[in-house]
């Protein structure tokens, strides 16, 4: 069996990482500006995380959310304090795509609507609704092309106001910094305009 062809592969075999550096099989050192799709924000092989993860896996690698897990409760408590959202609930999942999928689903449960605003060149994942919110027709299968999403130009505040005024928007999904889109940053005005959805129950 071969690996599924997800991306064009660079001819490099990374075998080790430490801090912000990685090494290939030939021992060539690289400064890691990629970070595994920008998800390795803590760097590689940090001794604290290596110790904590090793200890946890040695005791219990995984169990169900249907039993008490004190470690999960500690994470929720600490994250609440750090973020300032102590009155929120933490839903632990495996990936950004799952996070986006469930956020959109919860929004739809809340207001009963089905239309989502996303932005040109956005990337939100490869699962069902997350991929539909991703502005890339080449990875949206016919089964995912359900007309739930309208794509607006990033930083077009007037387009956002007009779309929200229709009254049928379930949610607005936006990246803090677009990665796939070319490191584009929403302006302060654009980010503020997404808060207009609150007045439209979205």
Predicted regions and their residues:
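Short beta-strands and strand-loop turn motifs
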Residues: 31-34, 171-178
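Active-site core of PLP-dependent enzymes with the aminotransferase class I/II
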Residues: 162, 177-195
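Glycine-rich loop-to-alpha-helix module at the N-terminal edge of alpha/beta enzyme cores
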Residues: 29-113
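Active-site-adjacent loop/helix segments that line or gate small-molecule/cofactor pockets in enzymes
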Residues: 1-21, 56, 78
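Residue-level signal for well-ordered, solvent-exposed loop/turn and beta-edge residues enriched
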Residues: 28-29, 183
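Single conserved hydrophobic/aromatic residue that forms the stacking wall/gate
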Residues: 196-202
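PLP-dependent aspartate aminotransferase-fold enzymes
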Residues: 77-171
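Short, acidic, Ser/Thr-enriched surface-loop or helix-capping motifs
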Residues: 24-25
């Amino acid at each position: 069996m071969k690996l599924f062809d997800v991306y064009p592969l660079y001819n490099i075999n990374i075998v080790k990482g430490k801090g912000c550096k990685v090494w290939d099989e030939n021992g060539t050192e690289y400064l890691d500006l990629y970070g595994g799709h920008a998800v390795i924000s803590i760097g590689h092989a940090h001794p604290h995380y290596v110790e904590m993860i090793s200890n946890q896996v040695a005791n219990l690698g995984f169990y169900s959310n249907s039993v008490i897990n004190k470690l999960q409760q500690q994470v929720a408590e600490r994250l609440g304090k750090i973020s300032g959202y102590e009155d929120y609930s933490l839903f632990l999942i495996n990936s950004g795509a799952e996070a986006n999928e469930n956020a959109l689903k919860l929004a739809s449960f809340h207001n009963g609507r089905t239309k989502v605003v996303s932005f040109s060149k956005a990337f939100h994942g490869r699962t069902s609704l997350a991929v539909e919110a991703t502005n890339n027709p080449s990875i949206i299968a016919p089964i995912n092309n359900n007309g739930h999403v309208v794509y607006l130009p990033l930083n077009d505040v007037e387009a956002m106001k007009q779309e929200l005024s229709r009254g049928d928007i379930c949610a607005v999904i936006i990246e803090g910094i677009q990665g796939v889109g070319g490191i584009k940053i929403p302006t302060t005005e654009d980010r503020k305009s997404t808060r207009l959805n609150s007045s439209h129950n979205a």
